[in-house]
Amino acid sequence: MRLDAASVATTAIDFARQFVDAPLDKQKGGADHTTTTEAGQDTPFATGPGDGNAVHPNDVRQNGYGSCAVLSSLVSIAQQDPGAIRDMIQDNGDGTYTVTFQEPIEIFGMQLGTREVEVTVSGPFEGGAAHPSGDVSAGGQQEVWPAIIEAAYAQQYHAHDPQYSTGVNPADVMERVLGVSAQSEDVGSVDFGTIERQLENGDAVVAWTSSTTDANGNSVFATPEQQAIADSYGVVPGHAYGVREVVRAGETYVDPNTGQEVTAAEDMIVLENPWGSNDAAMTFADYQAVYYQLNSAPTSP
């Protein structure tokens, strides 16, 4: 019997749907990734002063190597849906943590669902891309949820380059954390109102600065004009920032670096640096001049 293309596609999709809800085998590991610590030295979650929630964007403090895409995605997800992060980490009580990612299932370009992938990592986490948040539990334990997820992501999806020297796409991170489809768009094609609606709807949103490489192999902005704009805000090239808010002209916002309330003279965007410092409040026009890609994903179906 000869099947036409539509019949083949339908048969393949029906076959794949059998496995959408079937979890993958648990991916255990971490023995050669980190060293097991005594139970109780770290804790996934702790509520720090002014947090309001044990999972907070200010918990993320990137260290020196290139996991900004992972950590900026976590910044934005923590802002919009802290429960999604809490639900993905299980403390095994022995110094190890099991992180559950949502692996998209696609066939012929159609996403049919997700499978759970469990990845177990062990501490201590002092040397990873994410420092402990600085928040401490009543028992004196350091909060380390960003480092736990970063280590698990590296182990599962970036084992060939655990220090992320080749970078990661924030859209991939969002999909694997949230189990939904993420979007990647040119900054120039996403206007102020669209970002405003995305944030109001609870979407996680991350913006990348543009970059090129100079003769010495350093990441730089492509033009002197871009470099001058970026320098005026302390923004660096080839770096991912979580989008905290957009502010219309005439509205007030809190400057992320001074803590002072400011009235916007023109449309503004506030971006959170996963370093844990050097956030940026930029005019929307300047943001469009030095950023090149916007990644977003809904945090709820």
What kind of region is each of these model predictions?
Residues R2-P301:
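Accessory/interaction modules and long regulatory regions
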